[in-house]
Each structure stands twice: as C-alpha cells, then as structure tokens.
UniProtKB/Swiss-Prot annotation:
Protein name according to UniProt: tRNA (guanine(26)-N(2))-dimethyltransferase
InterPro entries for this protein: SAM-dependent_MTases_sf, Trm1, TRM1_arc_bac, tRNA_met_Trm1_C
Binding annotation for Zn(2+): C251, C254, C271, C274
Role description: Dimethylates a single guanine residue at position 26 of a number of tRNAs using S-adenosyl-L-methionine as donor of the methyl groups.
Binding site for S-adenosyl-L-methionine: R41, R78, D94, A123
Keywords carried by this UniProt record: Metal-binding, Methyltransferase, RNA-binding, S-adenosyl-L-methionine, Transferase, tRNA processing, tRNA-binding, Zinc
Family annotation (NCBIfam families): TRM1 (TIGR00308)
EC top class named in words: transferase
E.C. designation(s): 2.1.1.216
Reactions catalysed according to its record: guanosine(26) in tRNA + 2 S-adenosyl-L-methionine = N(2)-dimethylguanosine(26) in tRNA + 2 S-adenosyl-L-homocysteine + 2 H(+)
GO molecular function term, any single one: tRNA binding
Pfam families: TRM
Length: 386
C-alpha cells in the first residue's frame, strides 16, 4: 500500500495514496482517509478536550486514565490526534487488517504508544465487550448499525457522525424510515431535520440502556451531521430525555408549523392556520441542539491550538452557540417567494423583526436561515414592509 505523510494540528501520520484519477477520497482505497474532514477532526480535538476536562472536574483520575474509543479508525488520524493533542488514552479500532497495520505504524510514528492502543475487531463486538469514557462513531455512511453497542459502551460522552444525509434529510425517504425509524421531510429546513432525527434515534437507543442525554454541540456541515452528547446514567434521566421527543406538523401552503411533544399523540392532518393539508415528521428530538457554556469551552480549546481550520471552526461554533433554542429554522427566501416579495438584506430583516418584540437569530445551517419565536404571519408582515 502506497502511503504519504500528512499533518493535521500537531500530529503527523501516514495515509494511503488514493488510486490514480480518483479526485475525491475514495472508498476503493485500501484504507479510507478524507482530507475534507479536517474541520470535523479539528473540532473533535477541541470538543473532546472540553469533555475530558469535564470528566476530571467530577472524577478523581488523571488525564491519561480517561479512555476514548475511535470505533472505526481507518488510518487512525482522528484517534491519534486525540491521544497526541488531548493526552487521553485512545483505543483505535478497525476491522480491516490493512487499517490495523497502518494504525500500528502511525502509533509508532506519532510516539504515543503509552496512551494509544490498536485493536482489530468488529466495532459492535468491541463496544459490547468494553466500556469507554468517550465513544466516537465516525462510520462510512449511517451510524445506526452501531448505535445500540455505542450507547451501551459510552460512560460519559458520545460523539457521532452521520454521512448518510440523503436518508436523514428526507431525500431518500424509505431509506430514512428504515434506518432511523422516523418520518423525515425533504424541505427548506431538511438539514436541521436530519440533525433532530439523528438525535431522536440516539435518545431512543440510550433509553434502552436506561440512559439519558444532553446534546452539547450538533451541526450539519457539508455532507455530514455531527453531534457531541453527554450521557447520563439512570432510568429517570432516560424518561426525562423522552420528554424532548415528539413530532412536527408543517404546512407548505402558508408556512405555519407546530411541534408536539410525546410519542403517543394525535395530530390533525390539516393546518390550524389555513386548513390545508400538513406534512408530519418524527419522532425527532425537540430539545436543545447546543449547550452555550460547552460551546464557549470548545472555543477556548480552539483558541489555544494551532489548527488548519481554526477560523472556520470558531465561526461555526460561534454560530451554533448563538442560535435560538427553537425547532426549526425558517428560510427567508422561501417565505419571500411564498408572499411574492424580493428578499431584503438579512441584517435589515432581522433588525426589523426584533422591533416587533420577537427573539431572532441567524443559524449555522445556511446564510439565509433564521430562528425566531415570532408567528409566521408576523414574519410575512415584516418582509412585506421592507
């Protein structure tokens, strides 16, 4: 296997040279490596360091005693960066013999053999066998085949990436139903829909093991969804998390939407505002996507590090921190098209909407999205006035 060396953060590893003529990081390579996920990994380093410090505040243990599982490690770059740049013990697992060999090579290359362990196992088997303070799932595709084992294995924190955004966001409807046991909607806020369906699925998996969760940071970026969750042991905490599960009713005719908390509920097929048929999505997570204090902790970690995507990462985390804690965002252009007006500048529109007494924020999802507690009729009136 031909390889080349790459450096991310302060960590240098060997990664496979992709097949000739293949422009995008290919699944055909003997060991998968995606340079476009450097932002994801940079944030992971900062976020995992923030998680580790939270563990140390509550547990009488040393940094190196905290265990982190990179369940599908491939080249090992994510887990090795955690070991090298965070200083906690990383278990780097991959079922591929080629990947396992490369991980062993990279452990030697980075000089972290005292706090890095390579394993070559089925990820589900490993997670059923052992418990880890932090479990990181970053599979090629959907994380759903691994969530039962991961939610059992994670003691304090669970970090999950989903790259199957088409099923999550409703573009591949039946696939999304099968994988996530939820009805998605493929509309203007489909990216947030994907985040909340993923979180809803994780909450239900955790509940099977009498665990609850608190989302600390969740974002939809490029072709993937990523979330960082605090895991909370106890049946009562699992029950509490279930109170943040529910459904969305959305009218595409007038833009009215309603959320309904609970799993066994009755929802009208008709819009309570205009009477037209509505689309219903769920079950999905209706609680917070981000914890502002945790976002600040991640920002401090980013500031203290030399990272290739530092400014981009900081911008993303700031946007997440400052989002209103409301499901779901609105798309300004969709509403303008609905009422037949030109879209004004976002800053001017947000200022005008705030003058009505409404709370408003931009979001990290798109440049033309916003969240508000204003009613749809108020939003339309403001847009017509500009």
């Amino acid at each position: 296997m031909l390889s080349t060396k790459v450096t991310e953060g302060s960590t240098t590893v060997s990664v496979p040279v992709p097949p000739e003529g293949v422009p995008f990081p290919p699944s055909e390579a003997p060991v998968f490596y995606n340079p476009h996920m450097e932002l994801n990994r940079d944030i992971s380093v900062a976020a995992t360091s923030a998680c580790a410090k939270r563990i140390l505040l509550k547990k009488d243990m040393e940094l190196k005693d905290i265990t982190y599982l990179d369940a599908m490690s491939a080249s090992g770059i994510r887990g090795l960066r955690i070991a090298n740049e965070v200083g906690i013990t990383s278990i780097l697992n991959d079922w591929s013999d080629d990947a396992y060999g490369l991980i062993l090579e990279n452990i030697g290359l980075t000089g972290v053999s005292d706090i890095a362990e390579a394993t070559c196992k089925n990820a589900n088997v490993l997670m059923h066998e052992r418990r880890f303070n932090i479990v990181d799932l970053d599979p090629f595709g959907s994380p759903t085949p691994y969530l039962d084992a991961a939610t059992r294995s994670a003691v304090h924190f669970l970090e999950v990436t989903a790259t199957d955004t088409a099923p999550l966001c409703g573009a591949h409807f039946n696939s999304g139903m099968r994988k996530y046991a939820a009805v998605p909607l493929n509309n203007e806020f489909h990216s947030e829909m994907g985040v909340r369906i993923l979180l809803g699925k994780i909450a239900r998996e955790l509940a099977k093991h009498d665990k609850g969760m608190t989302p600390l940071l969740s974002h939809a970026t490029r072709h993937y969804v990523r979330t960082y969750l605090q895991v909370k042991k106890g049946a009562k905490l699992a029950d509490k998390a279930f109170k943040d599960l529910g459904f969305l009713s959305h009218c595409e005719h007038c833009g009215h939407r309603e959320i309904f908390h609970g799993m066994a509920i009755s929802i009208s097929d008709h819009c309570s505002s205009c009477g037209n048929d509505v689309y219903i999505a769920g079950p999905l997570w209706l609680g917070q996507l981000h914890e502002p204090q945790y976002c600040d902790e991640v920002l401090l970690e980013l500031e203290d590090r030399s990272l290739g995507t530092k400014e981009q990462a900081k911008k993303l985390i700031l946007a997440c921190r400052d989002e209103l804690d409301i499901p779901f965002f609105y798309d300004q252009h969709v509403i303008c098209k609905m009422i037949g007006v030109s879209a004004p500048a976002m800053d001017m529109f947000i200022a005008a909407l705030r003058e009505t007494g409404a709370n408003v924020s931009r979001t990290h999802f798109t440049g033309i999205s916003f969240k508000t507690d204003a009613k749809i009729d108020t939003i339309k009136d403001v847009l017509r006035s500009l």
